[in-house]
């Protein structure tokens, strides 16, 4: 396993290479030690993986990884290719793209790449939030999403091999405190 933290959960069951997920030398070491590689989230360097894997060593490939690493690509893929309903959104390449938003609605502005768990995001509820939103939109390509009211948040892992598809049990996210997120 590759992880920046020596005491990561996988360390209890696997030999660990301690390095950032974008360390190509560490990815190479991992590829040399393993017959098959997988990844569980989008914080892995797709170019680095492509540079070090052997044919067939990464069954899921990097196409979906690249899509999931860019919110613009992800929204386009989900809404146009997968026909999934997503929150109303628009691409914002600069603060000018935010000039005429309807402030009777709430939004979240998210950087297209690099942001996660609230990083690279700005909630827009009123005109008072626009200055920070303009700064963010001028610093990177972004996606402006309308807020969607929801009752719960789940994660679903789906795995396929081109013939068979497996849907794993859903994970329900609950929050007992402002910063504590639990999966049950």
Describe these PLM feature segments.
Residues 66-84, 89-94, 100-106:
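Glycine-/Pro-rich loop/turn segments that contact NAD(P) or position catalytic residues
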Residues 34-37, 86-88, 119-120:
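Short active-site oxyanion
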Residues 78, 89, 103-124, 139-154, ...:
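ATP-grasp fold ATP-binding core
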Residues 11, 59, 83-85, 113-118:
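Short glycine-enriched loop/turn motifs at secondary-structure junctions
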């Amino acid at each position: 396993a590759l992880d920046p933290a020596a005491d990561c959960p996988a360390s209890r069951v696997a030999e660990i290479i301690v390095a950032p997920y974008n360390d190509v030398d560490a990815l190479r070491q991992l590829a040399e030690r393993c017959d098959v590689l997988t990844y569980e989230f989008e914080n892995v360097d797709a170019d680095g993986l492509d540079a070090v894997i052997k044919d067939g060593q990464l069954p899921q490939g990097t196409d979906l990884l690249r899509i999931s690493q860019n919110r613009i690509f992800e929204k386009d893929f989900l809404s146009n290719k997968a026909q999934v309903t997503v929150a109303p959104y628009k691409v914002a390449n600069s603060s000018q793209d935010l000039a005429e938003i309807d402030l009777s609605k709430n939004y979240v502005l998210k950087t297209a790449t690099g942001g996660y768990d609230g990083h690279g995001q700005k909630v827009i509820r009123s005109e008072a939030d626009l200055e920070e939103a303009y700064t963010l939109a001028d610093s990177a390509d972004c996606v402006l999403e309308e807020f969607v009211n929801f009752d719960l948040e789940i994660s679903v892992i789906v795995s396929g091999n081109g013939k068979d598809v497996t849907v794993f049990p859903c994970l329900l996210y609950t929050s007992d405190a402002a910063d504590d997120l639990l999966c049950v």
